[in-house]
């Protein structure tokens, strides 16, 4: 098993690795909508927050020589599920190639770190 911290990756909000790799699978820790340059500072609204979360996930994957095309499963956590679900889906969908959407679970939660509106974690598979 390998524990990865990606140089230049998002600043952890708690004690964890950016990703853990075992048996060809890479488990990417849930990412927040802040940026490595502005830890703890979140943009307003689900559109900007979803974009930042996806950018952070891409950064972690790229640091491990992977991309979104290697993702087999995504889990999305929303604090305002009813209000933000449709817009989050529009932004989320824009990051994936046609016909290459991973399996996904999306749930409403009562709270996230930094009072974020969204968090996403991934499972990827090495080719």
Model-flagged regions — what are they?
Residues 1-55, 59-72, 78-127:
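N-terminal presequence-like segments and the immediate start of the first folded domain
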